[in-house]
A protein has these predicted regions:
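N-terminal amphipathic/basic leader segments beginning at the initiator methionine
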Residues: 1-28
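Glycine-rich phosphate/diphosphate-binding loops that line cofactor/substrate pockets in enzymes
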Residues: 19-34, 52-57, 85
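N-terminal small/polar loop signature for handling phosphorylated ligands or for N-terminal nucleophile
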Residues: 42-115, 233-244
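Glycine/threonine-rich beta-strand-loop-alpha-helix active-site module
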Residues: 74-181
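Carboxylate- and glycine-rich phosphate/diphosphate-binding segment that chelates Mg2+/Mn2+
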Residues: 152-260, 370
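C-terminal catalytic subdomain
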Residues: 262-315
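C-terminal charged capping/lid subdomain of soluble metabolic enzymes
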Residues: 303, 307, 313-386
Length: 386
């Protein structure tokens, strides 16, 4: 049995570590970085101050921010043009999942001869890339959700099909990660909830995924516990620095752990994100109890095994009740139909997209297209599997 274990990169953690950004560039021999963040962040005073500090070290600092949530392939192509015309030699990716994913994809694609979609996470497609031409990446998350800072992939939407594609290469893992909780203090309660549930989905699906990976299991368990202890605290008091640090850590841990696998929560979410622009963390939160109850026969013993660690009664029902209570306390809608118009959606097409998503193969219970369609129907009606 041959299994490769890949774990995080260099991580600089703590308050005010953002002030070490120029030092991080120096350590990686980056002399002309491209600063990537989304258009919602670029005009914030916090980000303006970061850019001003960087310009003291890099007078001709180039920036790219022409994208928002759920980025598309064209955003990456435009960023690559900025990178190359500015003769950059590295990327600083700052933001939530979108900013990190776009920045990583730009660093990956800046010198490749093949189109982006040729590197989708299918089989050995990643070997098509010229790994010697992938630029160094520094990742700075401003939300605690996707954990893209410790991931080796980017989620990018193919505008023509509406499908969210995973672009993968081992060298897309950032070389230095800066986790500074001060950058997350002004995150709204709504985004704190959605991104926190995204991190929970990563840790939970990694823990439940089939296969032998005790290192990932241990990291995922602690990630779930950090979220259980701190998500409500940060939701109620955004300035709780310890809770914010816990959530940043849990997000990075989730992305680290899910190399073991993801499952139906993510494969159901990706089509909804791509076709209807629903926030990824929010859709993960909505689908979570429906997928848990669908998978119950396969994961019940696994779930019971962590209940003691989470100070829950030792039963699947106790864990499910915690998830439902957590969602309620975070004002997460119970049904998919609460966040989008489900009256005229093509469930056949949506369930086929979910079935073809790479995450489906990591679900602990084998799935077919009809299973995924049934979970969609349950999430629309609000009825959990018995």
């Amino acid at each position: 049995m041959g299994i490769n274990w890949n774990y995080p990169t260099t991580m600089w953690i703590g308050e005010n570590r953002i002030e070490d950004l120029s030092l991080a560039c120096k350590e990686l021999n980056i002399s002309n970085p491209l600063f990537v963040t989304d258009k919602d962040l670029i005009n914030l005073d916090l980000i303006k101050n970061i850019i001003l500090r960087l310009k003291k070290s890099f007078k001709n600092l180039a920036t790219f921010s022409n994208f928002t949530g759920n980025p598309i392939g064209e955003n990456v192509e435009e960023g690559v043009k900025v990178y190359n015309t500015s003769t950059c030699d590295g990327v600083i990716a700052l933001g939530g999942g979108s900013g990190l994913d776009v920045g990583k994809a730009i660093a990956f694609m800046c010198n490749q001869s093949r189109p982006l979609w040729d590197f989708e996470d299918i089989g050995d497609y990643w070997t098509r890339a010229d790994s010697s031409k992938i630029s160094k990446i520094i990742a700075v998350p401003t939300t605690a959700g996707t954990g893209s800072e410790t991931g080796r992939a980017s989620a990018i939407i193919n505008k023509e099909t509406g499908a969210k594609k995973i672009i993968f290469h081992p060298k897309m893992l950032p070389s230095i990660v800066i986790l500074d909780p001060l950058l997350t203090l002004d995150l709204s309660p709504r985004l704190t909830a959605a991104t926190g549930m995204d991190a929970l989905a990563h840790n939970l699906e990694a823990f439940c995924a089939p296969g032998y990976h005790p290192m990932a299991d241990g990291i995922a368990m602690e990630g779930i516990k950090l979220i259980k202890n701190s998500l409500i605290k940060a939701f109620k008091n955004g300035k709780d620095i310890d809770a914010r640090m816990d959530l940043l850590s849990a997000a990075s841990m989730g992305s680290t752990a899910f190399q073991k696998g993801l499952g139906a929560i993510h494969s159901l979410s990706h089509p909804v994100n791509g076709k209807f622009n629903v926030h990824h963390g929010l859709s993960n939160a909505i689908f979570m109890p429906y997928v848990l109850t669908f998978n119950k026969s396969t994961i019940e013993n696994k779930i019971i095994s962590i209940c003691d660690y989470l100070n829950l009664n030792k039963s699947f029902e106790s864990f499910l009740d915690w998830i439902l209570e957590l969602r309620n306390n975070l004002n997460i809608p119970h049904k998919l139909s609460d966040v989008m118009d489900c009256n005229n959606i093509d469930l056949e097409k949506l369930s086929l997209m979910a079935f073809e998503d790479p995450s489906t193969g990591g679900n602990p219970k084998k799935l077919n297209q009809n299973d995924l369609k049934e979970i969609y129907l349950k999430s629309i009606s609000g009825e959990l599997f018995k």
